UniProtKB/Swiss-Prot annotation:
Keywords: 2Fe-2S, 4Fe-4S, Cytoplasm, Iron, Iron-sulfur, Metal-binding, Mitochondrion. Component of the cytosolic iron-sulfur (Fe-S) protein assembly (CIA) machinery. Required for the maturation of extramitochondrial Fe-S proteins. Part of an electron transfer chain functioning in an early step of cytosolic Fe-S biogenesis, facilitating the de novo assembly of a [4Fe-4S] cluster on the cytosolic Fe-S scaffold complex. Electrons are transferred from NADPH via a FAD- and FMN-containing diflavin oxidoreductase. Residues 138-159 are annotated as: Disordered. This is Anamorsin homolog. Its main location: cytoplasm. GO terms for biological process: iron-sulfur cluster assembly. GO terms for cellular component: cytoplasm; mitochondrial intermembrane space.
Length: 228
C-alpha cells in the first residue's frame, strides 16, 4: 500500500462501509465512524462487491458527504466502480494502479435568479367575447340558409339530388319531404273520384300525381327505391 493511500486511511471522521466480506489488506484496522448528520463526512471508503448494493451505497455516501469530500471504492472491477460513482454524482479521477476507484463530491450550485413577471394582471389577459362578433353574426339565418347545401355542382336549372353516399344532410331532407307528401296525400279527399285509377285519370291538381293506382280507402305507401 502506498504512503498516500495509507495517509488517507488515517483521516479522522472516516466513514467505512463494507458488505461483511474480507477486507482489503491495510484496511482491517481502520475504525469507521457513525454518521449522525447529513453533510458531515469528509472521507469514506467502500468495500462492497455486489453491483446493486454498491450502487445503493454510493448514493447514500454521496448524500451524507460534505462538498469536496473524497471516497475510495475497493473493488475487483474498477470499471463498474467508476460507473457507479459517476451515477451517484461523484467526479471520478483516474489514479495509480495501486489505488482503488476514487470519487470526489463536487457540486456547484448556481446563483439565485429573480424572475421579473412584470405588473401584468389577470384582467389584462381577458378578451371580451362579444367584441369578436360582427354585426352579421347577430342576424337570424333564413330557411334557405338552413337547408342542406346539396350534392354535386350548383346548377340553377336542375334540382339537386342526394348522392348515394350523401353526408351533407340532403338525403335526410328529401326523405322528410317525401314522407310529408305521403302524409298529405293520405289525408286528402278525392273531389273527382278518379284519384285511385292512376295518373291517366287524375286531374292536374290531384295530390296523388306520380303515385301508382290503389284501391279506394287504401293507404298509399311507396317503397324506398335507390335511383342510382
Amino acid at each position: 500500500m502506498s504512503a498516500a493511500l495509507s495517509d488517507f486511511l488515517k483521516q479522522s471522521n472516516l466513514l467505512q462501509v463494507t458488505d461483511g466480506g474480507p477486507l482489503v489488506a491495510g484496511t482491517d484496522g481502520v475504525e469507521g465512524t457513525r454518521v449522525d448528520l447529513v453533510g458531515e463526512v469528509e472521507h469514506a471508503i467502500i468495500q462492497v462487491q455486489e453491483t446493486e448494493l454498491l450502487a445503493e451505497v454510493c448514493n447514500t455516501v454521496f448524500d451524507v458527504m460534505k462538498q469536496n469530500g473524497e471516497v475510495l471504492v475497493f473493488s475487483t472491477d474498477l470499471t463498474t466502480a467508476h460507473r457507479k460513482l459517476r451515477i451517484a454524482g461523484f467526479r471520478v479521477t483516474e489514479l495509480a494502479a495501486d489505488w482503488p476507484a476514487r470519487g470526489v463530491k463536487s457540486v456547484n450550485f448556481g446563483d439565485k435568479v429573480t424572475l421579473d413577471l412584470g405588473n401584468a394582471t389577470v384582467e389584462e389577459d381577458l378578451i371580451d367575447e362579444d367584441g369578436l362578433l360582427q354585426e352579421e353574426d347577430y342576424e337570424k339565418p333564413t330557411g334557405d340558409q338552413l337547408k342542406a347545401g346539396g350534392c354535386g355542382p350548383d346548377d340553377p336549372n336542375k334540382k339537386k339530388r342526394a348522392c348515394k353516399n350523401c353526408n351533407c344532410g340532403l338525403a335526410e331532407q328529401e326523405e322528410a319531404e317525401k314522407m310529408g307528401k305521403i302524409a298529405e296525400a293520405s289525408a286528402a279527399k278525392s273531389s273527382c273520384g278518379n284519384c285511385a285509377l292512376g295518373d291517366a285519370f287524375r286531374c292536374a291538381t290531384c295530390p296523388y300525381l306520380g303515385q301508382p293506382p290503389f284501391k279506394p280507402g287504401e293507404t298509399v305507401k311507396l317503397s324506398s327505391v335507390d335511383d342510382f
